[in-house]
Amino acid sequence: MKTLIARHKAGEHIGICSVCSAHPLVIEAALAFDRNSTRKVLIEATSNQVNQFGGYTGMTPADFREFVFTIADKVGFARERIILGGDHLGPNCWQQENADAAMEKSVELVKAYVRAGFSKIHLDASMSCAGDPIPLAPETVAERAAVLCFAAESVATDCQREQLSYVIGTEVPVPGGEASAIQSVHITRVEDAANTLRTHQKAFIARGLAEALTRVIAIVVQPGVEFDHSNIIHYQPQEAQPLAQWIENTRMVYEAHSTDYQTRTAYWELVRDHFAILKVGPALTFALREAIFALAQIEQELIAPENRSGCLAVIEEVMFDEPQYWKKYYRTGFNDSLLDIRYSLSDRIRYYWPHSRIKNSVETMMVNLEGMEIPLGMISQYLPKQFERIQSGELSAIPHQLIMDKIYDVLRAYRYGCAE
């Protein structure tokens, strides 16, 4: 990461896409997409996804590392080209506890990530815990971030410290997109970004972390990009120019969250304006979902009723039976909920792919289609971009490859923006 940031600060148009997903097909696509390049691939886990207690994936940081490396070995992607990152590392998962208890767990969280070899650490102590004022004072956020940084430094080996990099910042959109409809978004003011940097510098130095400050590579700000279930707020470069100019006088770049669904031109403009780390998550699993839905429609037409997977019906049954991952985000009323479950840009369906019933139905669908010759006309109907690539000889009409290429469509836009 440090080399890439140095190149950006030297004037090169270069950025990196941060893949925030634990889905094996998304990770496989991210690695396979860059297998034949010289680029490194940044894959990040969030604190609620992966933590010392397992998170909602059931994986510790060490488990996640091995999970990613196993996929890399299968794909033929060199492990040393993978950068592992930890996102929102702090009391995010334990906000209902008092600050002392939550921070104690947060310290162990950060240590677990660093011990597991994660080298990009987002120190995010911005959330209020039980008994805390809302919002927290910037000084408190910075002091807690310094506690987390101290924890990281205390377990890092000398070799790890050479690679270790930190991201700071408190203006983080809701992970995975907004829960309610959005019309506009508040762009971070320069004075707030400067205050974030100033308070963190002061807190780090007070804890004897002056050297660790040199490892802070980025600050999280809101450049004016966001999405909810059916709306996207697109990047307006002119609105972010004060931020773009301010960061030029520092050693850092910006990290932009919730950049999903922007145009490829917007990604190029974001990187030009020093938002050099672009985080993406739901857009990748949304593309995966689109591919699976398309293949399910194809299966519906090609496979005899008694042999079909019933994939789409299984997904809906499971999500209505177990609504904990979408209920507080989506609209009420059966028809509205069904539309959101299927097509919401925030893609809460991503939490359900590991469910045994859904996983089995998708596997059945894939087996059903693997031995079939899918008519080109059907691929044109349901996967038109993939049809064009089949026509030009770039792609085969094999279900797994069709899913990969659908995810590649998202990664292609980021590659354009992060041009190297």
Curated annotation (Swiss-Prot):
Induction: Constitutively expressed. Belongs to the GatZ/KbaZ family. GatZ subfamily. InterPro entries: Aldolase_TIM, GatZ/KbaZ-like, GatZ_KbaZ_carbometab, TagBP_ald_GatZ. GO terms for biological process: D-tagatose 6-phosphate catabolic process; galactitol metabolic process; phosphoenolpyruvate-dependent sugar phosphotransferase system. Component of the tagatose-1,6-bisphosphate aldolase GatYZ that is required for full activity and stability of the Y subunit. Could have a chaperone-like function for the proper and stable folding of GatY. When expressed alone, GatZ does not show any aldolase activity. Is involved in the catabolism of galactitol. This is D-tagatose-1,6-bisphosphate aldolase subunit GatZ. Forms a complex with GatY. It comes from Escherichia coli. Pathway: Carbohydrate metabolism; D-tagatose 6-phosphate degradation; D-glyceraldehyde 3-phosphate and glycerone phosphate from D-tagatose 6-phosphate: step 2/2. Keywords: Galactitol metabolism. The gene is gatZ. Disulfide bonds: none annotated. GO terms for cellular component: plasma membrane.
